[in-house]
């Protein structure tokens, strides 16, 4: 719990930004040294933690920063839609590489390893756990199991059209039940991040708007094209 206390203090002093340093897959930025540099820059600018995907990226980042790292492994499985840290050996690899917090998919979907087993393995290795959830019931289930952090990460990403705005209602509902909520997913502007905190988030994770240059360039390009069409 010492880490949680330290993070809580840092959040109170610095504002509660967690930066997800996950470049677009196979892009020019998708290299461990660049991911590590992103993480360093984020910490220098006041991030209280970073979220890192992949063992090589984590190993490159760990020696360079002293804030907590939320570690994940993403996989594309042939028989399950679950992508985030689906296996027990993923947890072992993340712990060995220096993750302080290990995040896993906490959704109620077909999976190779039950959520409870993933959580127990994280704790067995002396790490804190974060469950990336999509719904209130999923979040509460993980919270009641003893998961330290509940992320709204998967809201909008388990089927159907992806919403444009964050799920603030989910953040509020979970926070009101005593969950330590990390708001994540479509917090693409400072104002939306602030609204996440207002909704009850313990911290807010921002990814694409900070570390996926291609996405941000596309947002600007689309806005300019839209204006050009209006001016015709």
Swiss-Prot record:
Q: Name one Pfam family in it.
A: NanE
Q: Does the keyword Isomerase apply?
A: yes
A GO biological process this protein is involved in?
N-acetylmannosamine catabolic process
Q: What Gene Ontology cellular-component terms does the record carry? A: cytosol
Q: State the reactions this protein catalyses.
A: an N-acyl-D-glucosamine 6-phosphate = an N-acyl-D-mannosamine 6-phosphate
Enzyme Commission number(s)? 5.1.3.9
Q: In which pathway does it act?
A: Amino-sugar metabolism; N-acetylneuraminate degradation; D-fructose 6-phosphate from N-acetylneuraminate: step 3/5
Which keywords are on file for this protein?
Carbohydrate metabolism, Isomerase
CDD domains, alphabetized: NanE
Q: A GO molecular-function term, please?
A: N-acylglucosamine-6-phosphate 2-epimerase activity
- Domain of life, per the record? Bacteria
- Give the UniProt family note: Belongs to the NanE family.
**What does this chain do?**
Converts N-acetylmannosamine-6-phosphate (ManNAc-6-P) to N-acetylglucosamine-6-phosphate (GlcNAc-6-P).
What protein am I looking at? Putative N-acetylmannosamine-6-phosphate 2-epimerase
Organism of derivation = Proteus mirabilis (strain HI4320)
Gene symbol of the encoding locus: nanE
